[in-house]
């Protein structure tokens, strides 16, 4: 039932998916996986009261279930309950200190709340774990700008562009920072490249030119692909669709 529910969800049939999840829970009320899956579906429908009930139940059944804590943190975030969000993310990191996905999200929330030094520490750890994480460089650069550490920001934008040469928003931001440093000729060059990248993107994506002209669409939900929660024995459905359901916070995009 859980697998068929996942298949229905993949096909966009949420009614049949929820029906199968309900059946799975009825058959085994002590398996947290059914509650987590149903709760995530409720959250996608913005039925947060029901979603929270399911996630609470999953955690009650398995107090070390980091995937449930992580998903509940996202639900708290959507409801702007930031202390509760941080509490659950911290709980994940108690069990899994090297969970890059959780560190990344916690770093972005620290930045949103103005705790820039804490944000830098989290993003530093993310990049130690996954040096190829484009958005971690991009967002850390934005934090450096807030701290007026402009040369550090330029270096992080350089790295983001090296990893993703079509990242127009990174070119644009780098142009802005170089202008602040008085490097006007370099700033103009970076700006011109950004405009060219945007034009190329629009030419290839005519129907979607307005919403993602900065070319960040490819990375809007990409963070690390090393399946931090795999050891919790959730099957491939949970991990495969994680990037869709997590909707990572790219606060400086």
Segments predicted by a language model, with ranges:
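Alpha-helical tetratricopeptide repeat
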Residues: 1-253
């Amino acid at each position: 039932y859980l697998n068929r529910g996942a298949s229905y969800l993949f096909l966009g049939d949420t009614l049949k998916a929820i029906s199968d999840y309900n059946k799975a829970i009825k058959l085994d009320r002590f398996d947290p996986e059914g509650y987590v899956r149903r709760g995530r579906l409720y959250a996608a429908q913005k039925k947060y009261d029901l979603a929270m009930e399911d996630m609470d139940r999953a955690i009650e059944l398995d107090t070390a279930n980091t995937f449930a804590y992580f998903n509940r943190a996202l639900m708290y975030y959507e409801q702007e309950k930031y202390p509760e969000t941080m509490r659950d993310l911290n709980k994940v990191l108690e069990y899994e200190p090297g969970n890059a996905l959780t560190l990344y999200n916690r770093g972005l929330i620290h930045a949103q709340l103005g705790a820039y030094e804490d944000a830098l520490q989290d993003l530093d750890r993310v990049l130690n774990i996954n040096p190829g994480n484009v958005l971690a460089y991009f967002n850390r650069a934005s934090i450096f700008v807030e701290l007026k550490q402009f040369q550090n920001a330029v270096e992080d934008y350089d790295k983001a562009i090296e990893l993703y040469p079509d990242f127009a928003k990174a070119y644009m931001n780098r142009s802005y920072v170089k202008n602040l440093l008085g490097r006007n000729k370099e700033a103009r060059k970076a700006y011109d490249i950004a405009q060219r990248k945007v034009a190329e993107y629009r030419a290839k994506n005519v129907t979607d030119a307005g919403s993602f002209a900065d070319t960040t669409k490819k990375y809007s939900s990409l963070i690390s692909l090393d399946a931090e929660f795999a050891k919790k024995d959730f099957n491939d459905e949970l991990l495969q669709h994680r990037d869709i359901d997590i909707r990572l916070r790219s606060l400086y995009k």
